[in-house]
């Protein structure tokens, strides 16, 4: 059975991302990080369904470094500690935390020493206002980047891409 269309069409690298020009356009913040091979810790915030987690994974894939994706809702302290230990085995590592606003303060605090010493880069994704929802110590060590809804034109680009892509509909249907 095929996976859902949205899953199959999910961007794998930054240059696959549609829209978000402030982040991934020619002079976008993340594009500059990638071109300079210089990653920083970030928190992507914005409405649900805008691609925050997808952008996080696309950035990690584009940086060609080890990464682990965690969900703040279900993560345990042991999983955080195990992930940090795994990061220490890699020259460059990223921890992606989805729904980071749901990560309790004591678990956020576990990240701080290794975030400070460069053991890993943090990419958080949240629908909440990071100024209110995140530990000030985490906020001060990350760049806060807003992810916005796609414009109508950007949505049309995505639909056209899905229609012609072999991973999408592969031109098997006619649309008028």
Q: What kind of region is each of these model predictions?
A:
Residues 1-36:
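A short, basic N-terminal segment
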Residues 2-3, 32-70, 85-86, 112-113, ...:
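Walker A/P-loop
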Residues 23-28, 65-95, 104-105:
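Short glycine-rich substrate-engagement loop in P-loop NTPases that contacts/grips substrate
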Residues 65, 135-149:
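A short helix-turn-beta junction within AAA+ P-loop NTPase domains corresponding to the substrate/partner-engaging
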Residues 70, 96-97, 121-125, 146:
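Structural recognition of the conserved hydrophobic beta-strand(s) that form the central parallel beta-sheet
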Residues 71-73, 143-156:
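Conserved AAA+ ATPase "SRH/arginine-finger" region at the nucleotide-binding site
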Residues 106-140:
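Conserved catalytic/switch belt of AAA+ P-loop NTPases
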Residues 141, 145, 157-171:
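Conserved AAA+ ATPase "sensor/coupling" helix adjacent to the nucleotide-binding pocket
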């Amino acid at each position: 059975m095929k996976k859902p269309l949205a899953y199959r069409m999910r961007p794998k690298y930054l240059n696959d991302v549609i829209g978000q020009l402030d982040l991934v356009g020619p002079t976008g913040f993340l594009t500059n990080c990638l071109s300079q091979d210089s990653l920083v810790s970030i928190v992507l915030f914005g409405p649900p369904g805008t691609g925050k987690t997808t952008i996080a994974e696309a950035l990690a894939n584009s940086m060609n470094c080890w990464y682990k994706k965690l969900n703040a809702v279900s993560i345990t302290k042991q999983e955080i500690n195990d992930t940090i230990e795994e990061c220490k085995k890699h020259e460059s590592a990223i921890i992606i935390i989805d729904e980071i606003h749901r990560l309790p303060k004591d678990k956020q605090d576990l990240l701080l020493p290794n975030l400070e010493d460069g053991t890993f880069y943090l990419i958080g994704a949240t629908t909440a206002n990071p100024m209110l929802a995140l530990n000030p110590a985490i906020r001060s060590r990350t760049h806060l980047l807003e992810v916005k809804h796609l414009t109508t034109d950007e949505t049309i680009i995505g639909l056209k891409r899905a229609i012609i892509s072999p991973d999408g509909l592969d031109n098997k249907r006619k649309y008028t």
